[in-house]
Every structure is written in structure tokens, then in C-alpha cells.
């Protein structure tokens, strides 16, 4: 993944081409009169649950009442926290909701605890260290009364009630291992996270920490340099961007980023570049490799297989679902990593196998070179699973590489997107709905609805059975963040980058049904 265009907030740059407990000082609050005042419901993990399904269990929002979804409260970022990081906005994390409190991190690494019912700021942990990997995504985890988060170079734990710092570890990353920019997962006494954009041996690394002390338990390199049968040229990158999957079988699975290489390099010195563009399954206690499934070997398009893996059961078979910017959904056997099916989503221009051809010395390219899905498209945000259906928000955004020595093209073409439903067992597309905008808010299920948000600043919902659009709500700013649904409330971070040279005021907005 390109170091300047990484994670969810990379979108802003592409669109521009085409178009420490302190007193609460980081934001202001407005509350809608007559809105539902509820503190019920939860969204306890980055993707709703440890299986990463993004299915809002216990949600009160459905097809029958979504038309009544109204603004409940708005929290406005102020001061330094409201300043754009790297020109791509202020918010890229997904909210966490536990015990009536919504937790959120901004791209300056500051953490907020807000009342779910009123939006009142309970406490703020001030870091003021801008996220550097993309910037973004980032975010926190909240487990057993402790908030876990990271700044670019350190990991910290806070008391969830007071925001008081419990521990911090500043010695986890070595030179060349990149920086932190991921929403961690916490389970079984361990904190799982990763670095991004490693530039030296090992590339980005996967880590597990002791949740009580912050001490390193294990570390796994996502780039190998001497494995039998692997010709890895050590160009760096790799690592993971999205929250990993912690499974009941004692494993943890990460979606890994791309190798940092040009088309010219991939053609002249082809390499599988393990474990880039793969889902990597490790023993959760030891970090030992169990299996991997590589979507694109020898990738030179900055594709990534970065989406949070999802745990599922397909006709009695434990499976893992993965996906990424190459525009494919993959289903793998959870025990072996064997690929069961893969399905293309979104638009493709016939060059899906270029990396495979280069690996076999059969690819010839000339610039300019049009890439679709582009490096800012495909499956950029996380998928959802409910019942026997997988829901995917897909971005169609081509990139033009004007030189084969570029790592990333600089000219974006016409942009569009869709939300699709796939059968869990077969991968067959059940419905495909086009949208007027870029769906980068992750797919999220609420009863018989599927929600996402559009980059341009719209919350949107679909009929889960048919794909028909049934709800739209204009947001106060552009958005790069996933939403969270807790009970009767939808929380939407709206703090994305500029559009047409203009930028709104970054806010965290809650909508609720009566």
C-alpha cells in the first residue's frame, strides 16, 4: 500500500484528483429536540463482534422504522483535533459502544468517550500525534473496562470510565517496521494489532501484546526473505490495516497489504512476495503460522487483501471470508486455508491476471496503463455477514499509471460504486445495487437492512432482501469511517477530506429511531 494513500482515508486524495486525562476541550455538543434519548444497545468490537460480521445484534432499526431515523446529537471536533491530517480529514476510525458510552479516536490519535444517549463528552485522552501510515485507519478497542489504542509509535491502555492511562509501550517497532494505524482487537488477554508500510526486512509486522501490561507476546513478519521456494526481493510494505479476526479455534487471522513495488520491478524480478495480499492465519497464543491464502502474488497495483476477515459456517464447514482492493471476495476453509471460491465484485477491465502473468514471465506492458479496480477502489472497507449472505460495498475508481516505474498511478478516472450481496456457500451474486457516490463506510447489517455511508457525505440503507435503496440521510461533512449501530442508534463519524476544495466541520453524529 502506498505510504501516502493508505487505509480508508486514502480516498480523499484520489477524489481531489477528480474533483493524559484533561478537561473536556476537544469538541462541542448539540442535541436535537425531541429525539429518542436511549443508552441501550452496544457495538463492543470494531466490526460488531469478534467474528467481524458487522451484524448489529439487538438493533431496534429495521425496514419498518428506518424512515423515522432522526438526528439525536452532534459532537463537533474543535481546536487542533479538527485540523486535517495529511490533507485527508480528521476521522477514519469506527466507533465502539459499551455500557452506554461511545468511544472514538481521531486522526491526531486523541480518544473521546461520549454518552450514547446525549453525546456529552465524558472524558478525552489527548495525544496530538497525527497518524502517519496513511493517515488512517485507526481506532480503539474496549474490553473489560479498558480502552486500548495506539499512536503512530506506541500502544496504550486507558481506564474506560475515567480515561486515566494504565500503561504505554513505546518500544514495539524497530527501524523499517512502519507505524501503527489500525483498530486493534482484544481477546483472551491479548491485544492484536499491526504496523503498516514497513520499508525494511520484515516489512509491516503483526503483533500480540499482553493486555494487562502491554508487554510483547509475539511478532510476525509479513515479508519473508529466505523461505524455501520464495524469491522475495524485500521491497517492504505488507503489514495489516484492518482489525484482525480472532476465532474460537485459537487462531487469529489478518488481512495483509501489498508489496511496495513498481510494474517494472514486478516484470523484471517477479516474486510471490509472501505474505503480501494474503489472509494470514496464526496461532493466537504463539504467533506461529498455521496457513495463508494469497489473493495476488507479485502485486504491483497496490491492491492489498486488507479487509477484516470474517468467520462463518457454510453448510457445516468453518470458513473465513476475505477481500481487498483487487475487487474479489474470497472464501477459505478455516482449518486449512484452501480457497473454496472467489467472486469478482465491482467493475474490472480485464487485467486481473497481470500479476500472475508477470510471475510467469508472460506479461508485457506499456504506459499509460489503466487499472480497474484501481488502488483506491475494489473492496476498500469491511464486509458484513448475516444469515447466508455476504454484503460488500465496492468502489469503481480507475487509476492511470503514466509510467511503469510508478508505484501508484496519479490520474483517477470516473468514479462510481455499488453494494452487492453474495451467497455464502457459492459466492453467487444475489443482488447488485449501483449508488451515486463512493460507498466507503463499510457494509453494516441491521435486521432487514444493510447500511453504509458514501464518501460525499450520505448515510444510506438498503433492503437486505432486494437491494432497493430505502433510506438516505445527508451528513454534515464527507466521511471515511465505518458506522456503528447500537440499539436504536446509528453513530456516523463525518470528518473526511475536502471535496471540490471545500471542507465541512468534522463531527460525530448520532441518529436514532423513537
Roles of regions detected by a PLM:
Residues 63-66, 100, 116, 160, ...:
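Inter-blade boundary loops/turns of WD-repeat beta-propellers
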Residues 274, 280-284, 290, 302-361:
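Acidic, glycine-rich loop-and-beta core segments that form the ion-binding/anion-interacting portion
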Residues 40-50, 87-110, 132-155, 177-206, ...:
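Repeat-blade elements of multi-bladed beta-propeller folds
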Residues 26-36:
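Sec-dependent signal peptide cleavage junction
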Residues 14-28:
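Bacterial N-terminal signal peptides
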Residues 113, 157, 208, 279-281, ...:
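Conserved blade-register residue in beta-propeller folds
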Residues 2-18:
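Bacterial N-terminal signal peptides that target proteins for export
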Residues 37-86, 120-129, 164-173, 215-224, ...:
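Aromatic (tryptophan-biased) beta-strands that constitute blades/sheets of beta-rich domains
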Amino acid at each position: 500500500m502506498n505510504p501516502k494513500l493508505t487505509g480508508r482515508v486514502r480516498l480523499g486524495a484520489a477524489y481531489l484528483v477528480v474533483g493524559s486525562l484533561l478537561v473536556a476541550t476537544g469538541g462541542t455538543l448539540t442535541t436535537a429536540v425531541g429525539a429518542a434519548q436511549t443508552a441501550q444497545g452496544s457495538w463492543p468490537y470494531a466490526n460488531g463482534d469478534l467474528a467481524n460480521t458487522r451484524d448489529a445484534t439487538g438493533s431496534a432499526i429495521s425496514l419498518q422504522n428506518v424512515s423515522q431515523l432522526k438526528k439525536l446529537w452532534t459532537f463537533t471536533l474543535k481546536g487542533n483535533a479538527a485540523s486535517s491530517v495529511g490533507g485527508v480529514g480528521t476521522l477514519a476510525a469506527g466507533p465502539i459502544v459499551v455500557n452506554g458510552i461511545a468511544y472514538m479516536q481521531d486522526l491526531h490519535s486523541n480518544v473521546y468517550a461520549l454518552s450514547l444517549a446525549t453525546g456529552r463528552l465524558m472524558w478525552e485522552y489527548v495525544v496530538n500525534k497525527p497518524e502517519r501510515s496513511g493517515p488512517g485507519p485507526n481506532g480503539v478497542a474496549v474490553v473489560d473496562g479498558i480502552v486500548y489504542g495506539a499512536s503512530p509509535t506506541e500502544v496504550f491502555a486507558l481506564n474506560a470510565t475515567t480515561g486515566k492511562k494504565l500503561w504505554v509501550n513505546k518500544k514495539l517497532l524497530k527501524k523499517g517496521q512502519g507505524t501503527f494505524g489500525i483498530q486493534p482487537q482484544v481477546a483472551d488477554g491479548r491485544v492484536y494489532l499491526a504496523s503498516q508500510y514497513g520499508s525494511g526486512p520484515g516489512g509491516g509486522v503483526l503483533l500480540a501484546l499482553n493486555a494487562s501490561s502491554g508487554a510483547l507476546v509475539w511478532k510476525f513478519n509479513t515479508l519473508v526473505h529466505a523461505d524455501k521456494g520464495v524469491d522475495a526481493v524485500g521491497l517492504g510494505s505488507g503489514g495489516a490495516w484492518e482489525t484482525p479476526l480472532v476465532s474460537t479455534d485459537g487462531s487469529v487471522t489478518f488481512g495483509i497489504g501489498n508489496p511496495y513495488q513498481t510494474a517494472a520491478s514486478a516484470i523484471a524480478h517477479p516474486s510471490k512476495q509472501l505474505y503480501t495480499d494474503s489472509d494470514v492465519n496464526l496461532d493466537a497464543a504463539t504467533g506461529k503460522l498455521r496457513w495463508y491464502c494469497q489473493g495476488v502474488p507479485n502485486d504491483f497495483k497496490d491492491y492489498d487483501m486488507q479487509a477484516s476477515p470474517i468467520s462463518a459456517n457454510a453448510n457445516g464447514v468453518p470458513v473465513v471470508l476475505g477481500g481487498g482492493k483487487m475487487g474479489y471476495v474470497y472464501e477459505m476453509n478455516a482449518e486449512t486455508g484452501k480457497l473454496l471460491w472467489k467472486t469478482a465484485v465491482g467493475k474490472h477491465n480485464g487485467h486481473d491476471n497481470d500479476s500472475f502473468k508477470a510471475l510467469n514471465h508472460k506479461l508485457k506492458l506499456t504506459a499509460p496503463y489503466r487499472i480497474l479496480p484501481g488502488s483506491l477502489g475494489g473492496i476498500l472497507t469491511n464486509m458484513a455477514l448475516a444469515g447466508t449472505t455476504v454484503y460488500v460495498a465496492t468502489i469503481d475508481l480507475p487509476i492511470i499509471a503514466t509510467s511503469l516505474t510508478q508505484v501508484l498511478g496519479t490520474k483517477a478516472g470516473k468514479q462510481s460504486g455499488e453494494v452487492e450481496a453474495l451467497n455464502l456457500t457459492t459466492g453467487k451474486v444475489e443482488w447488485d445495487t449501483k449508488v451515486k457516490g463512493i460507498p466507503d463506510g463499510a457494509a453494516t447489517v441491521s435486521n432487514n437492512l444493510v447500511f453504509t455511508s458514501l464518501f460525499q457525505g450520505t448515510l444510506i440503507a438498503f433492503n437486505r432482501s432486494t437491494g432497493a435503496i430505502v433510506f438516505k440521510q445527508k451528513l454534515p461533512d464527507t466521511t471515511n469511517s465505518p458506522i456503528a449501530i447500537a440499539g436504536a442508534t446509528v453513530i456516523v463519524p463525518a470528518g473526511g477530506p475536502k471535496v471540490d476544495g471545500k471542507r465541512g466541520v468534522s463531527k460525530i453524529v448520532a441518529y436514532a429511531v423513537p
